[in-house]
């Protein structure tokens, strides 16, 4: 059982509450620190969780570590406050100060998204040859930077960066709070960046509308000397002959399946990803965050980092955040 306290009552904090509610044998929330009285009432009614009106009250609860979900303007100060008390912290992004000390890891979840782990498994198999190029349109700013480094294995190499910004007129019909009553065309900003490393390249192309829109889909291309992945199709050469397979999500709960709605695994010739929480009704985002929680406990037990303050700061620097 992994026990954690939560600081903050924003949109991100609810992911950690849902994970504990859906996986009660794996995770437990010791309490959540909320300053706003209206939000205290809302969360008390919505979740079976202890509401703490002060940080001191939260820190008296029984936890392995604290998850900080404060707004980005207060992230660094909260980390410093908890580090001074020797409290281990899993903090939400972004983290822009690489000099922070203490037992801190950053919840960069995109490394642990099922499809991205499947891509990484294909890369590590060697069938693509030497991977040298990534083109991604799936997440914003520092998250994209972390994925670029994850797939290209460029470490802390500083690339040359070319940036442009375009306007992408698109109908906004959905948001964090659900479908809009009056969809309307908006001038969405589309950011494009080209990263030129010593012998590798990456192209970033993203609009925030993609997170909540089915008319602006995610795209991924990973290229190597012997093959490529384009979204869910992998093409490569074997003994000089072109081969191809589809990357397939295998789920429960569709049609006549009575096992409940969930992702079981991802396959493509071989098993590329297996859900560590089988039969759990978690979205891919929630699976990735739950994996961060597992990694945080492993970090505390072994000292093995999974996404450090240094990593987070470097990725923010690539987008000048």
Where are these regions (language model features)?
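C-terminal helix-rich "cap/oligomerization" subdomain common to oxidoreductases
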Residues: 44-46, 57, 65-70, 271-321
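NAD(P)-dinucleotide binding in Rossmann-like oxidoreductases
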Residues: 201-291
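Beta-strand-loop-alpha-helix segment that lines the small-molecule cofactor/substrate pocket
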Residues: 63-113, 126
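Receiver (REC) domain switch-region micro-motif
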Residues: 32, 66, 134
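Short acidic low-complexity segments
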Residues: 50-61
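Rossmann-like dinucleotide-binding domain that binds NAD(P)(H)
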Residues: 130-217, 221
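Rossmann-like NAD(P)H-binding beta-loop-alpha module
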Residues: 114-133, 144
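N-terminal Rossmann-like dinucleotide-binding module
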Residues: 1-47
């Amino acid at each position: 059982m992994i026990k954690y306290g939560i600081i903050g009552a924003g949109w991100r904090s609810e992911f950690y509450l849902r994970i504990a509610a859906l996986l009660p044998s794996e995770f437990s929330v010791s309490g959540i620190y909320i300053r706003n009285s209206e939000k205290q009432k809302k969360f008390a009614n919505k979740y079976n969780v202890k509401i703490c009106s002060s940080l001191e009250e939260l820190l008296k609860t029984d936890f392995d570590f604290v998850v900080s979900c404060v707004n980005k303007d207060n992230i660094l100060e909260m980390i410093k406050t908890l580090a001074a008390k020797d409290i281990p912290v899993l903090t939400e992004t972004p983290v822009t100060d690489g000099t922070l000390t203490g037992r801190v890891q950053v919840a960069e979840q995109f490394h642990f998204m099922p499809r991205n782990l499947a891509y990484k498994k294909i890369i590590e198999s060697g069938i693509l040859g030497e991977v040298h190029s990534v083109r991604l349109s799936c997440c914003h700013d520092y998250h994209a930077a972390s994925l670029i480094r994850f797939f290209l294995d460029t470490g802390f190499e500083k690339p040359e960066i070319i940036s442009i910004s375009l306007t992408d007129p698109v109908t906004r019909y959905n948001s964090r709070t659900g479908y809009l009553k009056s969809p309307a065309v908006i001038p969405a900003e589309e950011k494009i960046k080209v990263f030129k490393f010593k012998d590798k390249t990456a192209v970033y192309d993203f609009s925030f509308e993609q997170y909540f829109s089915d008319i602006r889909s995610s795209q991924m291309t990973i290229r190597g000397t012997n093959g490529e992945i384009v979204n869910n199709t992998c093409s490569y050469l074997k003994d000089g002959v072109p081969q191809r397979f589809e990357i397939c999500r295998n789920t429960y709960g569709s049609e006549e399946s009575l096992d409940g709605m969930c992702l079981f695994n991802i396959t493509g010739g071989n098993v590329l990803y297996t859900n560590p929480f089988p039969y759990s009704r978690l979205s891919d985002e929630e699976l990735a965050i739950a994996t961060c929680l597992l990694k945080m406990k492993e970090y505390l037990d072994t000292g093995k980092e999974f996404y450090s303050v240094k990593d987070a700061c470097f990725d923010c620097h690539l987008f000048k955040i």
